[in-house]
């Protein structure tokens, strides 16, 4: 009996790739054949995918980077990617195509639309990304990570939550150790690509904490390559025990051991925080399309599980005050951790799997 075949299309950031990885893990366990279609940027994140996942790098591009010449080449490169993917799909037909957003998902979704293959998209944020907005009315359904999600007229939305990787599910609801007079961990995440503003502000905020509190703090700080040296030097100069890396491959473990998470409000980060259950201070990316990171944070802040600081209000003094507020009130910190758990959707992957299986049995749209 021929195995069913799922093609997953996802862009080159952790926000798109981590939920795609979660679906790949689940469908492989169910005996499906799984292929990931992405570009060179996305290929950097494939190390976490199960080794049985087939990987295809496609021709794609984005209007967000490069000069006039680079932008002029975007449409031809995407068109070439669609043509090549359509040719491949005619020879090797997927039962379902699922897009997770980002420009590299255009070739697979575009080809599936041309060939009228069963297809759907997953939107991680409370506001549709540009690519998902393009396809929202051209797919069987939009699986939504945040609810409500602003959808165009005619799009069929279904709330599933944001799938998290198996390594996160293994630590779902991990026991929380409230802050106290013993070593305490702070995890600083700027999304999969780091965030300069966190590298500018967080070290100074931790240095500004009273010595009787600061002496117990251990920091794991994700910083961009170009910021790593100065951030490391700052922590060392102020006697702060810190590990600084451009990317942590063991975020679930570090998060489960943390007393506090300081993070952007990307969909995957918020999902991990909710499923593991940790107090957090969230700084939404101000330039995010449709201010979607503020929308992502709404469930956590509404449950009093997170403190939200807009970028315009962020400085070391303000952040230090909020860090101290969490780490000097253990009972309140424990309440925040429990409240975070109440917003999580650890069954999001199962819900998404159900939609994929239903779509595989339906008539081609």
From Swiss-Prot:
Membrane topology value: Peripheral membrane protein
GO molecular function, one term: undecaprenyldiphospho-muramoylpentapeptide beta-N-acetylglucosaminyltransferase activity
UniProt entry tagged with the keyword Zinc-finger: no
Reactions catalysed according to its record: di-trans,octa-cis-undecaprenyl diphospho-N-acetyl-alpha-D-muramoyl-L-alanyl-D-glutamyl-meso-2,6-diaminopimeloyl-D-alanyl-D-alanine + UDP-N-acetyl-alpha-D-glucosamine = di-trans,octa-cis-undecaprenyl diphospho-[N-acetyl-alpha-D-glucosaminyl-(1->4)]-N-acetyl-alpha-D-muramoyl-L-alanyl-D-glutamyl-meso-2,6-diaminopimeloyl-D-alanyl-D-alanine + UDP + H(+)
Pfam families found in the cross-reference section: Glyco_tran_28_C, Glyco_transf_28
GO cellular component, one term: plasma membrane
Protein's name in the database: UDP-N-acetylglucosamine--N-acetylmuramyl-(pentapeptide) pyrophosphoryl-undecaprenol N-acetylglucosamine transferase
Record lineage: Bacteria, Pseudomonadati, Pseudomonadota, Alphaproteobacteria, Rhodobacterales
Gene name of the encoded protein: murG
